[in-house]
């Protein structure tokens, strides 16, 4: 017993000294909430980090230090400081933390977790390849899949035959359950088209065991990457618990298997000697670009291509699908704005809305941005790591080398310096061109590569949905606006009642 007490007090002493030395290593060291040994500030952050961290951030004027176990973090929400770090001093703050690399693959593959010169070369490779497939055909495909999903709803939704007519035209309501699966299915379908040039119907996808397994794998993987799973890595004395990450990587192996099958099939089809070959998707384009630049493919490059495809599949599916969930929730809870958007779309005098119409839908665009501002999908972004020590903010704040950095997107969104009445939902807020844009897609060279296709999906799907249907909750009461935190933030899953417009 005496030995156990000695070890316990030794651990307390170790952490106390570690915290004190780090917090006092420079006269400009950051302030933050008082940590307790072993836990650091975990008990103050609580399980709702996306809600508590913005409150702490406001108290410390947009930048503070935080201890997660034995790991030192800097959290920043002040826009000027974010720009200074992520744009003006990008080279010092461009890398991801090691933990995130551990869970997404090694640092030589993909785009989400790689660092340094490898990230530079992969970013250049992806931009060359991505531009070749991001064209009008993709926007046409998004519209096609949106209309296909509407038809699927009408054929497979639950029709309320016994209730009275829901409108003066005698249209019956259609109940749509499992909305999350269908919204994610739409985005996953678009990703499969862009990455692998595959086009499958929603009927086939809804009945497909493989498709449901892909959907489940992505959600499980992202749920496993939330801050409280990562904390195991922060508590250095509990490193054996990191075996849990093996299970996370196992979940990713199913996606790796799919990428391998697609690559092996595609490499047999490509004629590298033909000048007439045209890339039909991202996979084609990646293969051809590397082959042209490097005069052939080696094993490491092949693994890199597959990892890039997996990164696009995961990131492009969950974030866009969750954004659609939030926007529809706010449309249901604010029917007066739903009607205003419909009138805006109706003035276009078109039976279907395309990406080219975005410039003529300012209120819808503002509604989307305001929802994104109040409910950012990645409220704490993905962690970065400083390479060298640096003093920022007009020589006010000292950032040590090898420090983990969190960009507090939610804190930025709730800052009165950026937005008037930031806690209020004002869908016309962004009609004023002087209002600051959101940070939902990041900032600087390492922002979201897929921003354009994501916003096109959101606009095309929502505009045509509103043009063709009125949306309600099943009981005509407001939908709950509870937040479920993983790597992204989603609302509580809900069902929808749709009524066809005439």
UniProtKB/Swiss-Prot annotation:
The chain crosses the membrane at residues 3-20. It is found in: Membrane. The keyword tRNA processing does not apply. GO terms for cellular component: membrane. One of its GO terms (molecular function) is oxidoreductase activity, acting on paired donors, with incorporation or reduction of molecular oxygen. Heme binds at residue 448. It is an enzyme of class 1 (oxidoreductase). It is a single-pass membrane protein. The keyword Iron applies. Keywords: Heme, Iron, Membrane, Metal-binding, Monooxygenase, Oxidoreductase, Transmembrane, Transmembrane helix. Its EC number is 1.14.-.-. Disulfide bonds: none annotated. Its cofactor is heme. Pfam families: p450 (PF00067). Belongs to the cytochrome P450 family. PANTHER family: CYTOCHROME P450 307A1-RELATED, HEME-BINDING MONOOXYGENASE FAMILY. This is Probable cytochrome P450 554A1.
């Amino acid at each position: 017993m005496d030995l156990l007490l000695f070890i316990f007090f030794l651990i307390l002493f170790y952490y106390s000294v570690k915290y004190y030395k780090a917090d006092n290593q420079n006269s400009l060291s950051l302030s933050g909430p008082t940590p307790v040994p072993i836990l650091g500030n975990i008990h103050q952050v609580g399980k709702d980090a996306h809600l508590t961290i913005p409150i702490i951030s406001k108290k410390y004027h947009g930048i503070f230090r935080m201890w997660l176990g034995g790991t030192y973090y800097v959290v920043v929400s002040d826009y000027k400081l974010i720009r200074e770090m992520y744009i003006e001093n990008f080279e010092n703050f461009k890398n991801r933390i090691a933990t995130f690399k551990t869970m997404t693959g090694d640092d030589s593959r993909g785009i989400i977790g790689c660092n340094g010169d490898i990230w530079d070369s992969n970013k250049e490779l992806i931009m060359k390849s991505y531009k070749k497939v991001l064209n009008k055909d993709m926007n046409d495909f998004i519209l096609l899949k949106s209309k296909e999903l509407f038809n699927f709803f009408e054929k497979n939704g639950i029709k309320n035959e016994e209730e009275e007519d829901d409108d003066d035209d005698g249209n019956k309501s259609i109940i749509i359950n499992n909305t999350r699966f269908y919204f994610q299915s739409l985005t996953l379908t678009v990703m499969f088209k862009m990455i692998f040039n595959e086009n499958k119907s929603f009927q086939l996808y809804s009945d497909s065991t493989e498709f449901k397994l892909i959907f489940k794998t992505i959600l499980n993987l992202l749920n496993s990457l939330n801050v409280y799973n990562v904390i195991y890595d922060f508590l250095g004395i509990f490193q054996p618990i990191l075996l849990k990450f093996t299970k996370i990587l196992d979940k990713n192996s199913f996606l790796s298997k799919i990428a391998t099958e697609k690559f092996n099939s595609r490499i047999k089809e490509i004629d590298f000697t033909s000048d007439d070959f045209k890339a039909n998707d991202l996979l084609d384009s990646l293969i051809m670009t590397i082959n042209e630049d490097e005069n052939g493919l080696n094993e490491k490059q092949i693994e890199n291509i597959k990892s890039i495809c997996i990164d696009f599949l995961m990131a492009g599916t969950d974030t866009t699908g969750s954004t659609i969930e939030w926007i529809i929730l706010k449309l249901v809870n604010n029917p007066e704005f739903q009607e205003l958007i419909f009138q805006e779309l109706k003035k276009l005098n078109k039976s279907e809305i395309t990406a080219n119409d975005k410039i003529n839908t300012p209120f819808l665009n503002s509604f989307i941005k305001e929802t994104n501002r109040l409910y950012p999908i990645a409220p704490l972004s993905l962690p970065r790591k400083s390479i060298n020590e640096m003093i920022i903010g007009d020589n006010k704040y000292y950032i040590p080398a090898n420090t983990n950095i969190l960009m507090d997107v939610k804190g930025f969104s709730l800052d009165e310096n950026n937005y008037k009445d930031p806690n209020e939902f004002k869908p016309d807020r962004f009609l004023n061109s002087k209002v600051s844009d959101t940070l939902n897609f990041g900032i600087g060279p390492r922002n979201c590569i897929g921003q354009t296709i994501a916003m096109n999906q959101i606009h095309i799907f929502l505009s045509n949905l509103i043009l063709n249907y009125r949306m309600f909750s099943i009981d005509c009461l407001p939908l709950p606006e509870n937040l479920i935190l993983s790597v992204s933030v989603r609302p509580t899953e809900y069902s929808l009642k749709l009524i066809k417009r005439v």
